[in-house]
Swiss-Prot record:
Principal EC category: translocase
UniProt keywords, alphabetically: ATP synthesis, ATP-binding, Cell membrane, CF(1), Hydrogen ion transport, Ion transport, Membrane, Nucleotide-binding, Translocase, Transport
Catalyzed reaction equations: ATP + H2O + 4 H(+)(in) = ADP + phosphate + 5 H(+)(out)
Protein name: ATP synthase subunit alpha
Segments forming a coiled coil: none
One family name in Pfam for this protein: ATP-synt_ab
Its job: Produces ATP from ADP in the presence of a proton gradient across the membrane. The alpha chain is a regulatory subunit.
Quaternary structure and partners: F-type ATPases have 2 components, CF(1) - the catalytic core - and CF(0) - the membrane proton channel. CF(1) has five subunits: alpha(3), beta(3), gamma(1), delta(1), epsilon(1). CF(0) has three main subunits: a(1), b(2) and c(9-12). The alpha and beta chains form an alternating ring which encloses part of the gamma chain. CF(1) is attached to CF(0) by a central stalk formed by the gamma and epsilon chains, while a peripheral stalk is formed by the delta and b chains.
Keyword Cell membrane attributed: yes
Length: 502
């Protein structure tokens, strides 16, 4: 068998023509130092700020410090298996999370991965977690109410859709309870709720999820959790992941409520990262950009203009104070960013006033324009009445000889405080709130014993439901106040049937 040189050269030429190069150019760096969730990497000269990188063991990281000779990378996962000398690959992607309807009812971590054991989340849509807030011309002023179902808030510190309302108070003053009740009250309100738990105990998050499930609220809620046992970068990223999931709905014309529980822990996680990255510390050892950390997050809550679809994100950030000190660094920062604050006081909480809202220090800067007409009418003087009662109460402790007007004010104040108390996980529809506040402000409760106020309220609602349902329907459908005569007839009719306890 003879081998022909022409055939061989033809074969070689054919092979050369069919050859496809599979050379892939990758930007690879080398770990020069690792520890405490931070890796220093040499060789990634073209990396972008905030870009995702992949370590040789599959763990992801995020580029934070771009220095002359190395890159400071925060590791988004376990870092114990990463060694000096390991390769680090660029991905060319900025941090993204999955978004869309498929997330509703699920519990995810800040990377958008499910942690509820219910299988993968079947969505291919993602959004970058850092995005620009809507501009001035893309916004509209807040004008629709967001009913929390809590009398003290809806009457005194009303919240509108698209507002940022800070909830501030010491630990164990019922901050989370206020948020949970607000989420429960959004049932049938066409709202999507996102609860972001930052640095909470896993048992606490489990309790919140069970409460939401029991009341059917998981049908419209996404839970994003970065528990206390997780690395600091995940605690820092959690709020951004939550608001990004909300933005997908907002830009599609829907209304979203995002609860950040709580931003003090996010600030502490960011401080930890910044100090490990050797950034210069400032006041209370926080880095210089801790204000920007929160402002760029909360500015993404907005009420969009009609041209942009009219969707909204309402933000309820929490900040924990130490011994009621609202003049500390993080509290003052977040107060200045938000459109008002609800201050929960431990003294009130322990004296049995729950929710423990301090009406004097709490304020809503834009919510008043979103309040429905009926509520505006009955709650107009409530804040002043409550403030003057608190003042008189302190004064009345010293003397027993009080004139009739002062005594009447004290009596009315005691009943006001009693009416504004509310049980846990029992949000109240706005029409019922208006009914009891009308009875209070028009003096119908003045001759009812303080101990009977709770029962009076419950029985009044039942009586109106059965005999004067039109009153409730008018408020729920139009937001307007029915005529005073109708109210007076209903409440006087009820009072004739109400039996005071002995």
């Amino acid at each position: 068998m003879s081998i022909k040189a022409e055939e061989i050269s033809a074969l070689i030429k054919q092979q050369i023509q069919n050859y496809q190069s599979e050379i892939e150019v990758k930007d690879v760096g080398t770990v020069i130092q690792v520890g405490d969730g931070i890796a220093r990497v040499h060789g990634l000269d073209n990396i972008m700020a905030g870009e995702l990188v992949e370590f040789s063991n599959g763990v992801m990281g995020m580029a934070q410090n771009l220095e002359e000779s190395n890159v400071g990378i925060v590791i988004l996962g376990p870092y114990k298996d990463i060694r000096e000398g390991d390769d680090v690959k660029r991905t060319g992607r900025i941090m993204e999370v999955p978004v869309g309807e498929e997330l509703i009812g699920r519990i995810v971590n800040p990377l958008g991965q499910p942690v509820d054991g219910l299988g993968p989340i079947l969505t291919s849509k993602t959004r970058p977690i850092e995005s620009e807030a809507p501009g001035v011309m893309d916004r509209k002023s807040v004008h629709e109410p967001l009913q929390t179902g809590i009398k003290a808030i809806d009457a005194l510190i009303p919240i509108g859709r698209g507002q940022r309302e800070l909830i501030i108070g010491d630990r164990q003053t019922g901050k989370t309870s206020v948020a949970i009740d607000t989420i429960l009250n959004q049932k049938d309100q066409d709202m999507i709720c996102i609860y972001v738990a930052i640095g909470q105990k896993e048992s606490t998050v489990r309790g919140v999820v069970e409460t939401l499930r029991k009341h059917g609220a998981l049908d419209y809620t996404i839970v994003v959790t970065a528990s206390a046992s997780q690395p600091a970068p995940l605690l820092y990223l959690a709020p951004y992941a939550g608001v990004t999931m909300g933005e997908e709905f907002m830009y599609n014309g829907k209304h979203v409520l995002v609860v950040y529980d709580d931003l003090s822990k996010q600030a502490a996680a960011y401080r930890e990262l910044s100090l490990l990255l050797r950034r210069p510390p400032g006041r209370e050892a926080f880095p210089g950009d801790v204000f920007y950390l929160h402002s760029r997050l909360l500015e993404r809550a907005a009420k969009l203009s009609d041209a942009k679809g009219g969707g909204s994100i309402t933000a309820l950030p929490f900040v924990e104070t130490q011994a009621g000190d609202i003049s500390a660094y993080i509290p003052t920062n977040v107060i200045s960013i938000t459109d008002g604050q609800i201050f929960l006081q431990s003294d009130l909480f322990f004296s049995g006033v729950r929710p423990a809202v301090n009406a004097g220090l709490s304020v809503s800067r834009v919510g008043g324009s979103a309040q429905i007409k009926a509520m505006k009418k009955v709650a107009g003087t409530l804040r002043l009445d409550l403030a003057s009662y608190r003042e008189l109460e302190a004064f009345a402790q010293f003397g027993s000889d009080l004139d009739q007007a002062t005594q009447a004010k004290l009596n009315r104040g005691a009943r006001t405080v009693e009416v504004l108390k509310q049980d846990l996980n029992k949000p109240l529809k706005v029409e019922k709130q208006v009914a009891i506040l009308y009875a209070l402000t028009r003096g119908y409760l003045d001759d009812v014993a303080v101990a009977d106020v709770k029962r009076f309220e419950a029985e009044l609602f039942m009586y109106i439901e059965e005999n004067h349902k039109g009153l409730f329907d008018t408020i729920s459908q139009t937001g307007n106040m029915p005529a005073d005569e109708e109210w007076n007839t209903a409440i006087e009719g009820f009072k004739r049937t109400f039996a005071p306890s002995n």
